[in-house]
Amino acid sequence: MSYDLALGYLVSQNKQYGLKAIEILNAWAKELQSADTHQSEDNINFYMPYMNMAYWFVKKVFPSPEYEDFIKRMCQYSQSALNTNHGAWGILFDISSALVLGDHALLHNSANRWQEWIFKAIDENGVIASAITRSDTSDYHGGPTKGIKGIAYTNFALLALTISGELLFENGYDLWGSGAGQRLSIAYDKVATWILNPETFPYFQPNLIGVHNNAYFIILAKHYSSPSADELLKQGDLHEDGFRLKLRSF
């Protein structure tokens, strides 16, 4: 909610939106001192990017030392060192933290880590091996529904990488044309092909989950060419748009 309110403020300059956004962020800063479970650590890793970006939108008019201290406390829970979807979101967590804190060293390190993650997690064919086997059972990478969430988890990781790449691009690190960027473009075309023609997905089965969670294509289409992705964008069936990419461009 803080992200939507802050974005509303950014677009409309209605201070009521900004005040409500900072109220929510400050409440989190006051109440959450540490993470006591693995699930809470995961939640911090996945949701702090939205909160940090919300603060970034309102910081100039509504600065909050309390929220900035909160970020510093929470940074220890970033999972950016992992070569999984958790790691991709951890990189976005780190980048968003670096931007709001003005931490140039963290931003520089995150730019390097973004490239490293891509080379380690995405193969030369554009496949994220740790994602495509995901099932919907407690046997995360096996069982009778092995791969049913494979496209969904691929989308989830690529969403974080895409937002990270664009934030880096707008803040002095143009990596879209780098070797890692080219590897990302292959992954973009690969997942677009799977979404457009699900039967080509290695673990194709009825009722694949999260196939069209690809609103992030809106950004990648600015930098890369993919006929399959272009067709999907034309169709407009784009979901998982938590960053409201349909309403704004970074």
Regions found by a protein language model. Name each.
Residues 1-172:
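Aromatic-lined, polymer-binding surfaces characteristic
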Residues 22, 178-182:
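Short, charged, amphipathic alpha-helical segments
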Residues 103, 181, 225-229:
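Short, solvent-exposed helix-helix connector turns and helix-capping sites enriched
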Residues 123, 197-201:
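Intrinsically disordered or highly flexible coil/loop and linker segments, enriched in small
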Residues 163, 167, 171, 186-190, ...:
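Terminal, non-catalytic domain-edge segments
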Residues 172-178:
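Short conserved catalytic/interaction loops centered on acidic-Pro-aromatic/His motifs
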Residues 182-196:
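Acidic helix/loop microenvironments that form the catalytic cleft of cell-wall polysaccharide enzymes
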